[in-house]
């Protein structure tokens, strides 16, 4: 399905009775082909979705609430368009479920079917809300650099590495990622963490590269994969991981993670801007 056929940017009737058909899958393959990503994938990882506006009725008609987290594997053939995800979650509002396990089972079944792969679902109840963490991405901030920038369309030529120097292991972060929804043009704001092992990457060039996404259009997952593949091609690190945390829209935040080496799943800690 093409994004143009999704609910994005269209007048919407909000359903309040459970309806799995509201989920709108979008194949990953098209955007990957545009940047030369084929099989086998040069990375693995996950897309972490946090849903803050989930509510349903219990068997006695009393409203229940939870925060849902979805872990969508990067190798799944589809992503889910975010407005359709919001509408789908909203359809739970006036539907009675026997238990929270029944809600979780429905979410896992439906989102897995839309994505074409097994999706992990976790639900945090109000009793657990105080345990939820807020933290910033670890790493050396690129935003400390005082530099000029005037390129706002993606330009990987900014990416360079010093291959005549000894390899390093670095974790770099920036809060200056901004891209735009390819359907509505709405801005998407994000923070990015880049961990690599290899020839030292020029920090100023890397920051200018991230800034060059400012007028770029692409879904969150596609932008992170473009960042990953551009750094991999231009700088040739032995190990590379890219993790972005985007600010919330419509009660959802999307946090894609891509890596080419085995490591633990990144923390799902909400940043201050989220």
Swiss-Prot record:
One example of a Gene Ontology biological process annotation: queuosine biosynthetic process
Pathways involved: tRNA modification; tRNA-queuosine biosynthesis
Keywords in alphabetical order: Cytoplasm, NADP, Oxidoreductase, Queuosine biosynthesis
Pfam families linked: QueF, QueF_N
Domain of life: Bacteria
UniProt-listed Enzyme Commission number(s): 1.7.1.13
Catalyzed reactions: 7-aminomethyl-7-carbaguanine + 2 NADP(+) = 7-cyano-7-deazaguanine + 2 NADPH + 3 H(+)
Keyword presence, Metal-binding: no
Predominant subcellular localization, coarse grouping: cytoplasm
Compartments, as annotated in UniProt: Cytoplasm
Keyword field contains Transport: no
Gene Ontology MF annotations: preQ1 synthase activity
Function text: Catalyzes the NADPH-dependent reduction of 7-cyano-7-deazaguanine (preQ0) to 7-aminomethyl-7-deazaguanine (preQ1).
Assembly mode: Homodimer.
Protein name in the entry: NADPH-dependent 7-cyano-7-deazaguanine reductase
């Amino acid at each position: 399905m093409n994004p143009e056929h999704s609910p994005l940017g269209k007048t919407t009737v909000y359903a309040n009775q459970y309806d799995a058909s509201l989920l709108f899958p979008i194949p990953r393959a098209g955007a990957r082909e545009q940047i030369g990503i084929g099989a086998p994938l040069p990375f693995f990882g996950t897309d972490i979705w946090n849903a803050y506006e989930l509510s349903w009725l219990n068997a006695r008609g009393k409203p229940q609430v939870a925060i849902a987290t979805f872990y969508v594997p990067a190798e799944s053939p589809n992503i889910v368009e975010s407005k359709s995800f919001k509408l789908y979650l909203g359809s739970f509002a006036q539907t009675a479920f026997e238990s929270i396990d029944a809600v979780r089972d429905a979410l896992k079944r439906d989102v897995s079917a839309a994505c074409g792969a097994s999706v992990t679902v976790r639900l945090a109840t109000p009793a657990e809300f105080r345990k939820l963490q807020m933290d910033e991405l670890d790493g050396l901030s690129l935003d400390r650099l005082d530099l000029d920038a005037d390129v706002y369309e993606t330009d990987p030529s900014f990416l360079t590495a010093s291959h005549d120097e000894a390899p390093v292991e670095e974790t770099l972060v920036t809060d200056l990622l901004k891209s735009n929804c390819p359907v509505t043009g709405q801005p998407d704001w994000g923070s990015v963490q880049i961990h690599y092992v290899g020839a030292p990457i020029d920090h100023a060039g890397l920051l200018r590269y991230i800034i060059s996404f400012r007028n770029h259009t692409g879904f969150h997952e596609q932008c992170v994969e473009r960042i990953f593949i551009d750094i991999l091609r231009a700088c040739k690190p032995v190990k590379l991981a890219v993790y972005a945390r985007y600010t919330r829209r419509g009660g959802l935040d999307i946090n894609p993670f891509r890596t080419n080496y085995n490591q633990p799943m990144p923390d799902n800690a909400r940043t201050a801007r989220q």
